[in-house]
Amino acid sequence: MQSKFIKHQGATLHYQIGGTETAPVIVLLHGGFGSIADFAPLLPRLQQHYRVIAIDTRGHGRSTLGTAALTYAQAAEDARQILRHEGVEKYSLFGFSDGGTTAYRLGAADKNIEKIITVGAEWHKKHLDGVRPMFETINLDFVKENLPKQLAAYQAANPEPDAEKWAAALKGMWLDEGASGYPNENIRQIQAPCWRYVAKPISCSPLMIGRH
């Protein structure tokens, strides 16, 4: 995998690209407090069959946080910018957790997506009803106590580490109930085949989303 960087809306975004150049493109989007490194076990197999583009979300891995607020809408726009830069027209998405939520936003807005797979990803702000008290406690102390490995990896990899801002940015994204947050009912606009894995795989096609 080759590392590349582009500047976009105040941030330097890091991504890696590899695999078979003429193969279908798959874009990997990691979760909160994670990075491209989370996909390391999958990359050897994926590169045999796909042109793989793995993106460090702004503020994560080797991507700087920049000046724009970290939101699901911003993460989707960052991914679009990278894909435009690489000349990618059609692609599939694999998103874990926050990466899956970003994938839903991309799928709802963009019609050039071939397939979507998400793992442990939320799509509606109503899920906040059960987790808001925990999200509201997130700060640097929370990260130090509960996510020491992720914190150490971030501090080692990020060119502009600021763990307090990092935690605050994610807290803001997770609690965002506005237009820049969860896709909510817009998920019905997804036209690509979509598989959502929680405890078991569930279709997230427009016809199925209301049943789960």
Give each language-model segment a name.
Residues 101-149:
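Flexible "cap/lid" loop of the alpha/beta hydrolase fold
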Residues 203-209:
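Conserved alpha/beta-hydrolase "acid-adjacent" motif
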